[in-house]
Curated annotation (Swiss-Prot):
GO terms for cellular component: extracellular region; secretory granule. Its EC number is 3.4.21.-. This is Protein C activator. Keywords: Blood coagulation cascade inhibiting toxin, Disulfide bond, Glycoprotein, Hemostasis impairing toxin, Hydrolase, Protease, Secreted, Serine protease, Toxin. It is found in: Secreted. InterPro entries: Peptidase_S1_PA, Peptidase_S1_PA_chymotrypsin, Peptidase_S1A, Trypsin_dom, TRYPSIN_SER. CDD domains: Tryp_SPc (cd00190). The keyword Glycoprotein applies. Belongs to the peptidase S1 family. Snake venom subfamily. Expressed by the venom gland. It comes from the Eukaryota.
Amino acid sequence: VIGGDECNINEHRFLALVYANGSLCGGTLINQEWVLTARHCDRGNMRIYLGMHNLKVLNKDALRRFPKEKYFCLNTRNDTIWDKDIMLIRLNRPVRNSAHIAPLSLPSNPPSVGSVCRIMGWGTITSPNATLPDVPHCANINILDYAVCQAAYKGLAATTLCAGILEGGKDTCKGDSGGPLICNGQFQGILSVGGNPCAQPRKPGIYTKVFDYTDWIQSIISGNTDATCPP
């Protein structure tokens, strides 16, 4: 996260660190057994850490889990990287709520343009040269009009959100992918992609719109693994 500060240790109990083949992503615990992240974070040797804050000094309740099952949406459009960038992971063992671990529920309404949203992650705090922090950084950004992202990026999928600061300076960045966008306390987005370098004016982040996938997510969690994704 660019332009943010160290997150409060108590504000990200649902935040997962997804580490796979040397690449870093975020994720969100949505109940005791399931984590949501971005599809493009899917690599081999995936490990999922919960209850983390300082990567050098582990919390006593920090846990490591592995994916037992992974669910994706099959693409219906031409395969742009922004389309259906969502992955639902079943953990190999459930986790219990503890001092630094608790799930974040799915949204009951979609966000509106102008909403203030929290971003967070262990991604780089400088760009284009990367500086990876030991602690997650957090910042506040806004849901922007979709036209801003359409002007900045070609081939956007309809099931995405556009969020950032119009004049730049605050943004998610490399290593934050898959992490949550939390607007008015609701889990609304999964970081998909953004500008390179990060935090440039009029180059906001693209987030998978969680609200559009709630039926799919709930179907899979309840055992209907043939559930279809939104178009």
